[in-house]
Amino acid sequence: MSKVYDWFEERLEIQAIAEDVSSKYVPPHVNIFYCLGGITLTCFLIQFATGFAMTFYYKPTVAEAYSSVQFIMNQVNFGWLIRSIHRWSASMMVLMMILHVFRVYLTGGFKRPRELTWVTGVVMAVITVTFGVTGYSLPWDQVGYWAVKIVSGVPEAIPVVGSAMVELLRGGQSVGQATLTRFYSLHTFVLPWLIAVFMLLHFLMIRKQGISGPL
């Protein structure tokens, strides 16, 4: 076993990385409220795992979306549990994200030199809300359908480009299969990659600059 470890140690310098992580200074004023960002990340990882599991059974078509969700809930082993965890962790992620934003703002964590850390955090907050909007539509029940219709119609109030934005979101003049396909693509591919990039930037900057001091 030691030979295997030595082989990886020689190439990856695992010990140096471990020492760097374990020796990072943590300010004495840090309390439980500074864990809200980590809890948000944990919720996202749960979302990723449970969402990935459901993609094996979910069918993103207007004819089969609702029935596939019912199949997950009633026929798939522990499907009801996986979807319930996905649903409740989504709500928890939004709540923890809001509390995290408030904590950072109230403790001045957005001030120089951490402006870019704050910006990436705000971008991730917007992405998180977008996750909720797109995911809400995927069961394609009455609530999901009308939610999509209302949300996708909001940009129409924007001068000049409003109508074009609505058509882009819906994939046509009305809500239908193209709309569901777009929302499914956003929810399962575009947004996860996007938030992963901003998370990496966010964590690298926190790692570089450290936790902000007390007010």
Swiss-Prot record:
InterPro entries: Cyt_b/b6_N (IPR005797), Cyt_B6_PetB (IPR023530), Cytb/b6-like_sf (IPR027387), Cytochrome_b_N_euk/bac (IPR048259), Di-haem_cyt_TM (IPR016174)
UniProt main location, coarse: membrane
UniProt remark on cofactor binding: Binds 2 heme b groups non-covalently with two histidine residues as axial ligands. Binds one heme group covalently by a single cysteine link with no axial amino acid ligand. This heme was named heme ci.
UniProt: heme b 1 binding residues: H100, H202
Keywords: Electron transport, Heme, Iron, Membrane, Metal-binding, Photosynthesis, Thylakoid, Transmembrane, Transmembrane helix, Transport
Cell compartment(s), UniProt: Cellular thylakoid membrane
Gene Ontology molecular-function annotations: electron transporter, transferring electrons within cytochrome b6/f complex of photosystem II activity; metal ion binding; oxidoreductase activity
Record's bilayer topology term: Multi-pass membrane protein
Listed GO CC annotations: plasma membrane-derived thylakoid membrane
Residue ranges of the TM segments: 32-52, 90-110, 116-136, 186-206
A biological-process GO annotation: photosynthesis
Record: residues binding heme b 2: H86, H187
Cofactor(s) this protein cannot do without: heme b; heme c
Residue numbers binding heme c: C35
One Pfam family of this chain: Cytochrome_B
More about this protein: Heme 1 (or BH or b566) is high-potential and absorbs at about 566 nm, and heme 2 (or BL or b562) is low-potential and absorbs at about 562 nm.
Assembly and oligomerization: The 4 large subunits of the cytochrome b6-f complex are cytochrome b6, subunit IV (17 kDa polypeptide, PetD), cytochrome f and the Rieske protein, while the 4 small subunits are PetG, PetL, PetM and PetN. The complex functions as a dimer.
HAMAP family assigned: Cytb6_f_cytb6 (MF_00633)
Function: Component of the cytochrome b6-f complex, which mediates electron transfer between photosystem II (PSII) and photosystem I (PSI), cyclic electron flow around PSI, and state transitions.
Family that this chain belongs to: Belongs to the cytochrome b family. PetB subfamily.
Name of the featured protein: Cytochrome b6
